[in-house]
Amino acid sequence: MESIRTAIERASDYLTEHPEAATASDSVAKAVREDGLRFRVEGPWSPVTTDMAESVGGAASAPTPGWLLRAALAACDATLVAMEAARDGIELTDLEVSVESESDFRGVLGVDPSVHAGPLSVRVRIRLTAADATEDQLRAIVERAESRSPVRDALVREVPMTTELATD
């Protein structure tokens, strides 16, 4: 915990003094089709494979992209909670974040153009305990973590997005 707090303080101090260093391009994620609806997503770390359910033509051999979205939110929120607890000097004894969503697949399949393709709703459940913290302290940690979670921010804020098409 102390090493996390020290690293956060060092990075925060540096970016306070050098705000021009705070903006950078994120690593590229590239999805390459393997077969059918199965894709290998490549980046700077281990590749990830996705697939779709058999009901829509996939082989159900790997997580769906929608599940990876929920996994990204769960991992990001959990990471930020751990960082905020470390910043406060609170040793967590348990931290678990689960993310559920509801979707209407008419949107993905184009059956009804009025139905959104993305989740209709998302529920985040956080189980958090610490021997040396009150419930109010833990709630404050979660509130700060949620306000600083990049994945959560990308989901709730309208982020400018462009698409470039190459057909060669």
Regions inferred by a protein language model and the residue ranges of each:
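Extended beta-strand/beta-hairpin segments
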Residues: 1-71, 81-168
